[in-house]
């Protein structure tokens, strides 16, 4: 069994200060982000992701939404692009070419959530992930798609799962058949479990247990005490993670851990 490298980060002091100091100072060098999400019954996740990414300091963002949302979203966001949707208002398979083009443009992409449950959308999302070489951060109900279709994680680029502990339980139970993960684990047990899940899924994991935020990547795990119980943590963390990965693609573990610190600092400033 591979050993685990464990880093504890204080909410007042970054574990990787050099990364914080080297953050780009201009929009031109701050990365390009593609945000994907929404359906006729929900649009909050992609719009909130856009807002958080702007606060995090991303250079340029595009928000890809189903065309069925244009009449609503057009009044709320001016950077939206609208791709083919199904009759029920979810993403259609016909959107693949446009999404792949936008993913190629981007330094990272966040599949923010509010996709709804649609079989055609599931096919589209799997095709997008498998054919794109852009780092992808998955959140909200996108994690449920992955748990149902774990082959979505079989890709050449980095995949980051920003998942609740209950979603990780479902993922473990339905797909990777790892030892059970539970809410009553102590920190040492959870660190080992997250390391194993990350390696088994060939993805990075960000999750929350009580007020602790964990990052797991290729045998490395960090833990940061947020000292808050933020209900928006998934969308917010995914947005900050995507921004930091866009700017620091060669240092994923440090970037994701620093994204946690950065998001908590921004929360204090609000």
Which positions does each model-derived feature cover?
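Short, acidic/small-residue loops that bind anionic groups at enzyme active sites
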Residues: 130-149
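A short helix->loop->beta-strand "cap" motif at the edges of active sites that frequently abuts
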Residues: 132-138, 156-159, 202-203
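A generic structural signal for short hydrophobic patches within well-formed alpha-helices
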Residues: 143, 167-172
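PIN/NYN-family metal-dependent endoribonuclease catalytic core
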Residues: 157-158, 166-168
């Amino acid at each position: 069994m591979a050993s685990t490298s464990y880093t504890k980060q204080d909410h007042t002091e970054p574990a990787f200060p050099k990364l914080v100091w080297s953050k780009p100072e201009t929009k031109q060098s701050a990365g390009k982000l593609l945000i994907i999400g929404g359906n006729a019954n929900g649009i909050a996740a992609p719009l909130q992701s856009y807002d958080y990414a702007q606060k995090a300091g991303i250079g340029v963002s595009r928000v890809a939404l189903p065309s069925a949302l244009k009449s609503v979203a057009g009044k709320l966001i001016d950077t939206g692009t609208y791709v083919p949707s199904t009759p029920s208002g979810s993403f259609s398979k016909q959107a693949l070419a446009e999404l792949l083009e936008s993913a190629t443009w981007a330094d990272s992409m966040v599949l923010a959530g509010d996709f709804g449950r649609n079989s055609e959308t599931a096919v589209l999302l799997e095709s997008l992930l498998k054919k794109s070489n852009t780092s992808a951060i998955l959140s909200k109900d996108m994690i449920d798609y992955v748990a149902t279709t774990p082959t979505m994680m079989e890709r050449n680029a980095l995949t980051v799962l920003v998942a609740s502990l209950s979603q990780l339980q479902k993922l473990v139970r339905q797909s990777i058949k790892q030892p059970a993960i539970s809410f009553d684990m102590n920190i040492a047990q959870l660190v080992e479990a997250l390391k194993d899940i990350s390696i088994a899924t060939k993805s990075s994991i960000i999750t929350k247990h009580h007020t602790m935020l964990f990052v797991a990547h290729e045998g490395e795990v960090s833990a940061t005490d947020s000292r808050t119980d933020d209900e928006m943590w998934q969308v917010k963390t995914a947005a900050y993670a995507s921004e930091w990965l866009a700017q620091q693609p060669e240092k994923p573990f440090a970037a994701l851990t620093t994204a946690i610190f950065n998001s908590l600092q921004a929360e204090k400033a609000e």
